[in-house]
Amino acid sequence: SNVILADEINRAPAKVQSALLEAMQERQVTIGDETFKLPQPFIVLATQNPIEQEGTYPLPEAQLDRFVMKLLIDYPTGEQESRIVQEAAGGPGGRGLDPGSIETVCTPDDIIKAQAACVSIECVSAVADYAVAIVRATREAAGISVGAGTRGAISLIRIGKSYALLSGRAYLTPDDIKRAALPVLRHRITLSAESTMTGMTQDNTLRAIVDSVLAPRQ
């Protein structure tokens, strides 16, 4: 499959998480003595239940670092929720959501072309240095016990390039890096116990860090 959805990944035992880590890092899976290359593109999406922690297996930092972004999904708007309820409750037996009705919006080749277009976005050294400075600041900031690694800076630039592409630009700007900072870094930092007790969050901490790092002139 080109797209894998690991639902409530923190409920998967360590052995399953390890297998997923191999797939994400090596782009291959090993079954017994055989190794199978994965198709391209290969995209992994995973969900976590932030409320129910009983019976879960916390993901190790090395595996969290393999995920490019962490998105926070809130409740839908009233209009969206009404549509969900109507569609889910419609049809025979109340099963109105028919998987067969899903329309294709892009092909694997389309994704590969989009990835190539992102790679071609220009990133001058000043903007790359800015991304590195933000990541390095997470390692020195008060209230953070574990800061982001080098993969965090790489992901900042990659996601920043995707924002530039979606904005119709052929070059990366500091604003693209700022926009990418929270989704790219929130799962890559660990707050100290003292910070957590005072009500600090990853997002609040990262906003303060981004504000403190001088951005290059555009």
Region spans (language model):
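Canonical AAA+ ATPase core
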Residues: 8-16, 24-121, 161-166
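C-terminal engagement/docking regions of AAA+ P-loop ATPases
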Residues: 113, 138-218
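Conserved AAA+ ATPase small/helical "lid" subdomain
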Residues: 96-153
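Alpha-helix N-cap and coil->helix boundary residues
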Residues: 59, 80, 122, 126, ...
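Conserved alpha-helical scaffold flanking the Walker A/P-loop in AAA+ ATPase domains
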Residues: 1-5
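An amphipathic alpha-helix signature
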Residues: 78, 82-86, 128, 132, ...
